[in-house]
């Protein structure tokens, strides 16, 4: 069994669909949610996205919030929820990756890169296993 959390099917869906990212705010527990069009697979255990606005999502991450990402393939009633630990990078290899991604995709230079260590993966496939942890 591989130690890699992100299998080929997951990586493909992340590349083809717009992931939705949620973070939890402080003690209040109020969720913050939004699409992350720059979210992509970094390697078999990490996701990465460019933070462009420096708004509530970044603030929540700086306050220690975990992160949850949902990606769905609605026509096929399939999807995944990834739960992970985010790290903010203002320079170095991860930031360089974000800058290059922005340049390659006609985006503004990001304020920072957010690298997410995937801790858990859940299936969102319709049926009796929906919501079960798979990695």
Which residues does each PLM region occupy?
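Binding-site signature for planar aromatic cofactors or substrates
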Residues: 1-135
């Amino acid at each position: 069994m591989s130690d890699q959390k992100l299998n080929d099917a997951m990586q493909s869906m992340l590349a083809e669909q717009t992931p939705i990212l949620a973070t939890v705010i402080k003690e209040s527990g109020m969720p913050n949610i939004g699409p992350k069009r720059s979210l992509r697979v970094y390697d078999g255990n990490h996701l990465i996205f460019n933070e462009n606005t420096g708004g509530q999502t970044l603030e929540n991450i700086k306050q220690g919030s975990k992160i949850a990402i949902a990606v769905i393939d609605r026509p096929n009633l399939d999807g995944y929820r990834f739960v992970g630990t985010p790290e903010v990078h203002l320079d170095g290899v991860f930031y360089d990756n974000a800058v290059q991604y922005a340049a390659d995709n006609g985006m503004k230079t990001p304020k920072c890169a957010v690298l997410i260590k995937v801790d858990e993966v859940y299936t969102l496939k319709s049926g009796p296993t929906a919501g079960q942890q798979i990695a």
